[in-house]
Amino acid sequence: MKQLLDFLPLVIFFAVYKFFDIYIASGALIAATALQLVISYLLYKKLEKMHLITFVMVTVFGSLTLILHDDSFIKWKVTIVYALFAIALGVSQIMNKPLLKSMLGKELIVEDKIWARVTWYWVSFFVVCGLVNIYVAFSLSQETWVNFKVFGLTALTLINTVLTVVYLFKNMSEEDRKELK
């Protein structure tokens, strides 16, 4: 249920874009992200930091898109969010408080050097995705960018997540692997 809720704003953005335009879709994205927060709070009695950050970013960049009638703001939002993720992960690793380890380290027990590799891998991933987003957003058609944002970046993130879990699992001790099964 939680994962479906995470995709709600993206699905609504895409559907509204296909029937209307980028501006109505941007407004729908703001509303859907707010709805996501409300549903998340009602179901889980708490709000995740990532959802709050996403809501603020969507609201700011979506509103600028609507007010100035300029789709470049909603396009930049993707790159800025990825840049923030990369910075947060990189800084947390440099300060020896890796975010990924703090989120997953209780279930997936591996050496700190493995967490460092995974963290820098994700930093690189977010930087590359942010740069590719800039290229697609400003060099190709708006429709191509929307499809890339919805399907391309989502697929890349899911593939990256699977690869990360496989890598972490491979680097776990045999005993810890058995405990997960």
From Swiss-Prot:
Membrane topology: Multi-pass membrane protein
Domain of life (superkingdom): Bacteria
One Gene Ontology CC term in the entry: plasma membrane
InterPro entries linked to this entry: YciB (IPR006008)
Function text: Plays a role in cell envelope biogenesis, maintenance of cell envelope integrity and membrane homeostasis.
UniProt-listed NCBIfam families: ispZ, PRK00259.1-2, PRK00259.1-3
Protein name: Inner membrane-spanning protein YciB
